[in-house]
Amino acid sequence: MDFKDTLLMPKTDFPMRGNLPNREPDIQKKWEEEDIYRLVQERTKDRPKFVLHDGPPYANGDIHMGHALNKILKDFIVRYKSMSGYNAPYVPGWDTHGLPIETALTKNKKVNRKEMSVAEFRKLCEEYAWKQIEGQREQFKRLGVRGDWENPYVTLKPEYEAQQIRVFGEMAKRGYIYKGLKPVNWSPSSESALAEAEIEYQDKRSASIYVAFGVKDGKGVLENGERIIIWTTTPWTIPANLGISVHPDLEYSVIAVGEDRFVVASALVENVASACGFDQYEVTRTVKGKDLENIIAEHPLYGRDSLVMLGEHVTTDAGTGCVHTAPGHGEDDFIIGQKYGLDVLCPVDEKGVMTSEAPGFEGMFYDDANKAITQQLDEKGALVKLEFITHSYPHDWRTKKPTIFRATAQWFASIKDFRSDLLDAIKETKWVPEWGEQRLHNMVRDRGDWCISRQRAWGVPIPVFYAENGEPVITDETIEHVSELFRQHGSNIWFEKEAKDLLPEGFTHPGSPNGTFTKEQDIMDVWFDSGSSHQAVLEERDDLVRPADLYLEGSDQYRGWFNSSLSTAVAVTGKAPYKGVLSHGFALDGEGRKMSKSIGNVVVPAKVMKQLGADILRLWVSSVDYQADVRVSDAILKQVAEVYRKIRNTFRFLHGNLFDFDPKTNAVAVEDLREVDQYMLIKLNKLIDKVKKAYDEYEFAVVYHSIHNFCTIELSSFYLDFAKDIVYIEHADHPDRRSMQTVFYETLLALVKLSAPILPHTADELWSHLTFVEEQSVQLTDMPETITVPNSEATEEKFDRFMALRDDVLKALETARNEKIIGKSLEANLKLYPNKENKELLASIKENLSQLFIVSELTISEENEAPNDAQSFATGKIAVEKAEGEMCERSRVISKDVGANPKYPTLSLRNAEIVEKYYQK
């Protein structure tokens, strides 16, 4: 007979190869047909809620690695929470207004804006946004992200816009919204004001000039004709100069350079002299900054007054300690100008072109005017020094062009009135990483008022009317009416109708005796859109709650969505919209460089999924320290795929050895398991506790390493290795075999559930092959619970010591292999000469030690009986010889009793007995 037929070899239809790129779409199709999201929600509907609120990605273009990282992290949490006692809905969202969509449509002359009305152009923007959402939705679903994809929230949906209007109205009612002339970050290339979050810093080469302002009226402190030196890197703002700021507490020096007398901060005299090339100079006297107040200098180009003012913002970090002040072109300049009653002069238009308020430079683009202004200063003898520097300068994040500070009439949300409430709310929120708290605290503490208006077409209109006398009209009645109009018709109605048709019927206002009104043309900053989601989504949807348990986004969102959401929520509810905030870093290439098409180092999620599958991408996300920037490359993904293979093979081995196991009839009670099997259950319990704790603390790399290590170290290298001599060789119902299978069963169930949030496709694929489970998907189960093992501490301590001894045995076997004494470990006759403690340890182990060590022969003697060539270890001495006897054809174990049963000349007695009893017909 063929003895192979008598072996209980693994049987499984769970394939060895993942073939994920082909298999995952089928699994996802099945999820969709079953409506797995709804099934999970129904199963958990009576549990406490855990709401992770999706920060809406911008609906433009394909998803990149940053999107994948973000969405997968969210999915880990939502999937885990729904398997650990919570009802965890996930409603994905999209941010859909703003300049990138306008630009995408007008680029390459696809759409000619000038040939259509604003309303028509906005319709095209909306169509484009929906198309982008469709593309991104499919890509996000392909990642295996589970959510309410059929009912996402979208910032252009009428019901969303209606709620956004209510948020604006509530803030206006509380006095937080105002219109004012103020310098704002302005992008000439976009012709619009920008929020702080829309600015990025890049290096720029600029003129750096030192300019002298002659003293007109020295107030008895300075003498007429002495000259105050200012320093600036924006010569184009000199025509807007109305003053010079000095610090009240600084000391200022008058220095003589030839015939000239210059005034600079004493602490900067040497720097200025060096920069301006003053080889010889002398300090003639010093004065206190506060004594310079109200001195009048003369504008070097126009001869008008330039007032010396006191400002706390003046520093000695750079420059001269005398700060050129143009209230129309800087935040500090504006504030100090207000204090001293200066005009807000801004001689630059929305395109960045100098106006008639800058005589001599009218019609020039501001950057081109730099040269002309510098030349004129030189001609008038006011230019002390010109050089060029490269410095970090603000740029428009979309057009990548430089921005300027420019005073315009804008709508603002005043932060100062509720700043302390914002800071309190930050304190009450849980931040991961912890430094997030300080980061947002500092931003909120230092930020000015929020400019919420944009001079664009594609966005939510600012719902303000103007009376005949120019007074802005914002009342409960108008807000409610506009909100309702938007809910019914969408915000495009604002651009389709006249003001009178947008107001409540019969509306009157004292500022409009003739009953006529106009409407605001500006739209809201897109950060106001997404920042209103706590009201439009969390508060409005029945399946969600405000505050959310968690907001999770990239670290760029401290100044973006985390900030705008906090501002609007605290303004209208007094509380943060979130209980916790988690931030992640950016995805970089394998060398830690930013991904860019020009370098050719972009890793595209779609390509990774086509080649390796979504589960590999997800496993990569779980493997990285995502709170910092993360690296990804083909080589890194290859390593992750190797780990995946190991985990999958472990699943397959466990499953294959359960083909004849029915837990209802074959499972062994925990107290009846062999000790080594109990030991494995104890190790499994530790894994379960560790992994669940790691999920709870969002430490996914701990989950990844713990599962991987358990599969490779505890299972493959030990338990599953020696198992073969039992589960393949013994008869089906042998107690040792059923004992091991019981542990295989518990281990497989625990592993598939623990890995399900990270590897949902693989987990569900395996689940579909399990005959002993009732639920149709692993997603409809809960995380595994630990199993109580009697005397677990003593058993663990005992077998941990055994494992230390086993490590020494493996080293000794390896040495014997290198010395060609043996090939495989089954060729060994292992001779142990343990020390006293280990001799007692070995005596206490009831299991077959030859099996545990995977050797054919084993003897244990006193330590002092060891031969001279025995290897010494901390546990005792070990010698390895070649086992004597023949190899049993069935078990591959070398035995002296092979052929002892003449009916089976090639089998050992043990194997002959099994065959005769169970397989002989």
From Swiss-Prot:
Binding positions for L-isoleucyl-5'-AMP?
553
Positions of disulphide bridges = none
The cellular location(s) given in this protein's UniProt record come to: Cytoplasm
Top-level class of the enzyme under EC nomenclature: ligase
Family annotation (SUPFAM superfamilies):
Anticodon-binding domain of a subclass of class I aminoacyl-tRNA synthetases, Nucleotidylyl transferase, ValRS/IleRS/LeuRS editing domain
A cellular-component GO term for this protein: cytosol
Q: Which UniProt keywords apply?
A: Aminoacyl-tRNA synthetase, ATP-binding, Cytoplasm, Ligase, Nucleotide-binding, Protein biosynthesis
CDD domains on file: Anticodon_Ia_Ile_BEm, IleRS_core
Instruction: For the motif 'KMSKS' region, give the residue ranges.
Output: 594-598
Q: Name one Pfam family in it.
A: tRNA-synt_1
Q: Where is the signal peptide?
A: none
Q: Which residues bind ATP?
A: 597
- Primary role: Catalyzes the attachment of isoleucine to tRNA(Ile). As IleRS can inadvertently accommodate and process structurally similar amino acids such as valine, to avoid such errors it has two additional distinct tRNA(Ile)-dependent editing activities. One activity is designated as 'pretransfer' editing and involves the hydrolysis of activated Val-AMP. The other activity is designated 'posttransfer' editing and involves deacylation of mischarged Val-tRNA(Ile).
Its domain description in UniProt is: IleRS has two distinct active sites: one for aminoacylation and one for editing. The misactivated valine is translocated from the active site to the editing site, which sterically excludes the correctly activated isoleucine. The single editing site contains two valyl binding pockets, one specific for each substrate (Val-AMP or Val-tRNA(Ile)).
Q: How does it assemble?
A: Monomer.
Q: Mind telling me which NCBIfam families this protein's record contains?
A: ileS
Name-wise, this protein is Isoleucine--tRNA ligase
